[in-house]
Amino acid sequence: MYPSDKWTEQELQKLEKRLADVYKQAGKELDGKARNYFKQFSRRYAKEYAAYQAGKYTKKEFEAWLMNQYGRGQRWEALREDMARRLTESNEIAAAYINEKTPFVIALNHNFEAYMIKSLMPDRQIKEIGDIAFNLVDEHTVKRLTVRKQKILPPRRVLKSKDVHWNKKKLQNALLQGILQSDSIGKLAGRFQDVTGMNHTAAIRNARTAFTGAQNGGRQAAYEEAYQMGIDVVKHWTATKDLRTRDSHRALDGEEVPFNMAYSNGLMRPKWNPGGSL
């Protein structure tokens, strides 16, 4: 593994641990809220469930009763809104963590790639070009550039109203599925953990996408700097051979093009943002 790839992966693992803590806490809070909500129905549930078991109600009638009790009214609306906003808050924290780390990943990969370009250049070419001096950057430099021109590092953002709406819909679906599966009150509360898991999975995916973009963006910046000094640079597409990699990206593994040309799939690099500079 390329040293900078290894370092980037280590940083990603640290970030993923922080994200896991964020959603673990959110899941714990949601579970407590849900259990308190369903607890108020426990006596009535036991009575009506016994009647259902005795044949007083059909399964469909019992499900309708449960939905009227659990999934409608102001108390449920308030709980669902509260839980959805708590999950969106977690997503905002996750986005902030990602935005905090990506400048470091850009700087790390830019500086290492600059070092590799200079190290691998033959003495003859160095004599022809003359002094070779890359501008090494740190994460603070990258952040300052981002403030002046956001396209350099488009930040991860959470569209709050849209995110809350999505979570409310998923929470409603989780409750409905639990009722249709005849879940107990305890299991119904546990259903909402699946929604927390969906948000956690999305955050991990966003982190990996952002890190890959930052990694390749940092390298591309080093190539551009080398080109300005008269160094011919060729970039090489390396694809990870796992299920997270698109088939079209895996097919490009090993393809080489001049650094300022697009690959055969039209991308300048993996995770390329056409509107950005990196």
Feature names for model-found ranges:
Residues 1-197:
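N-terminal leader/targeting and assembly helices and adjacent pre-domain segments
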Residues 197-198, 202-278:
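Acidic, glycine-rich two-metal-ion catalytic cores of nucleic acid-processing enzymes
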